[in-house]
Design a protein with these regions (language model features):
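Beta-lactamase-like hydrolase cores
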Residues: 1-42
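Short, contiguous, pocket-lining structural segments
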Residues: 17, 46-47, 128-132, 153-160, ...
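Short active-site loop at a secondary-structure junction
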Residues: 18-21, 36-54, 69-72
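Contiguous, well-ordered alpha-helical segments that form the cores/surfaces of helical PPI scaffolds
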Residues: 23-26, 53-61, 138-142, 197-201
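A short glycine/serine-rich beta->alpha loop
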Residues: 38-46, 74-78, 121-130, 181-187
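Active-site SXXK
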Residues: 47-64, 83
Length: 212
């Protein structure tokens, strides 16, 4: 049986512990060997947006042309600030698409300031404002490049999603334990914390010019 979560931090006020935060952590070496482990680091979890780095690697393998800030938008969540939204539009424009192609649910920006500005301007929630729209736009651009269907690009059986699952397994060194539906409607893939750490170690030590 895996070790349960452990106390990682305490909130102390005037010498009295008023709160404890439990969790699990793992640190791996460049070769993926475990250096430090606390709590349960072997049971699968849904890393949610932490998987985006691996999925973006899969998109690069398929030919996604975005680089620099447009690759960053594919590899992480964004706050919905104007420059983020403009970047998502650039990804879509380059593929001959507009934001109507996005299947992200309508949302407000994560940025409170950006949300307040939109509310004052009388704007509404929109799919492009959702924090995962960069990844979705990059998937759509890859579909266009590969001449693949757009309407069902979020389906786990879609060729791009199948490849992204393979990228997660290859980079993490572990088979996906379960597939769910993330808040953006795209597949979310379960791996262990150790596998997630190994994936980031692989990315951080990758050769320049490699997909990672």
């Amino acid at each position: 049986m895996a070790e349960p979560s452990v106390v990682l931090a305490e909130v102390v006020r005037s010498g009295f512990v008023e709160g404890r935060h439990r969790g699990s952590l793992v640190v791996v070496d460049v070769d993926g060997s475990v250096l430090v482990a606390r709590g349960d680091v072997t049971s699968p979890v849904f890393p949610r947006s932490s998987n985006k780095l691996m999925q973006a690697t899969g998109l690069v393998e398929l030919g996604y042309p975005g680089r620099d800030e447009l690759l960053a938008l594919a590899a992480a969540s964004h706050d919905g600030e104007p420059h983020h939204v403009a970047g998502v539009r650039r990804i879509l424009d380059a593929a001959g698409l507009d934001e109507q192609a996005l299947r992200t649910p309508p949302d407000w920006p994560l940025s409170t300031a950006a949300r307040d500005d939109l509310v004052r301007a009388g704007e509404s929630m929109a799919p492009i404002l959702m924090n995962c729209s960069g990844k979705h736009a990059a998937i759509l651009a890859t579909c266009v490049l590969r001449d693949l269907p757009l309407d069902d690009y979020r389906a786990p059986s879609h060729p791009v999603q199948v490849h992204l699952r393979g990228a997660v397994e290859r980079m993490s060194g572990e088979p996906v334990a379960a597939t769910g539906v993330d808040g953006c409607g795209a597949p979310v893939l379960a791996i262990s914390l150790t596998a997630l750490a190994r994936a980031y170690s692989r990315a951080g030590t990758a050769d320049v010019g490699s997909p990672e």
